[in-house]
Each structure stands twice: as C-alpha cells, then as structure tokens.
Curated annotation (Swiss-Prot):
UniProt-listed GO biological process terms: translation
Protein name per Swiss-Prot or TrEMBL: Large ribosomal subunit protein bL27
Family indicated by similarity: Belongs to the bacterial ribosomal protein bL27 family.
Propeptide: 1-10
A GO molecular function held by the record: structural constituent of ribosome
Natural source organism: Mesoplasma florum (strain ATCC 33453 / NBRC 100688 / NCTC 11704 / L1)
Gene: rpmA
Record keywords: Ribonucleoprotein, Ribosomal protein
Post-translational changes noted in the entry: The N-terminus is cleaved by ribosomal processing cysteine protease Prp.
Superkingdom assignment: Bacteria
C-alpha cells in the first residue's frame, strides 16, 4: 500500500494592500497679518505671501520669501495702483 503525501499550506491571513493616500503638508498660514488702518510696529509682519501678490510701498520691506514687513511704526494702508495691482505702505504718525 502506497501513500501519496500531498500537503497544501494556505495563508492564514489575507494579504492586505497598501494605500498611497493619508498624508498632507502643514498649512503655511499665508495672508494678511495687518488690516488696512491697523497700527504696525517696526519689524512686524504685514503680509505673508508666495510671490508678489501685494507689492511693498513706502516704509515697507520685502523679505526673501516675499513677506512684507513694516520698516517704521505707523498705520497700515493698502492702495490700488497700475493695472489691478495692490501696494501696502506704512504711514508714520506726525510728530
């Protein structure tokens, strides 16, 4: 009498696929930090942006990442100029 040993092993756990979703980058908190008519101290950030959506005007500096900041303490003013462009300036109070 001959026995034929035929063993078959089956998976005890079902194979599970992976997903390519489920992650996101942190928001950069871009936009206006000071509104029109608000007081800004020298060195304070007025507008965080990528590119020059808002252009620097009088008493406003532009950082390496295009962030606009006040060079002097004063009142923030936004104004339109040119063809659909916006500029921000800081008006120092009269002494």
């Amino acid at each position: 009498m001959r026995f034929i040993l035929n063993l078959q092993f089956f998976a005890s756990k079902k194979g599970v696929g992976s997903t390519k979703n489920g992650r996101d980058s942190e928001s950069k908190r871009l936009g206006a930090k000071k509104a029109d008519g608000q007081f800004a101290n020298a060195g304070s950030i007025i507008f965080r942006q990528r590119g020059t959506k808002i252009h620097p005007g009088q008493n406003v500096g532009r950082g390496g990442d295009d962030t606009l900041f006040a060079l002097v303490s004063g009142i923030v003013k936004y104004e339109k100029f040119g063809k659909g462009r916006t500029r921000v300036k800081v008006v120092a109070p009269a002494e």
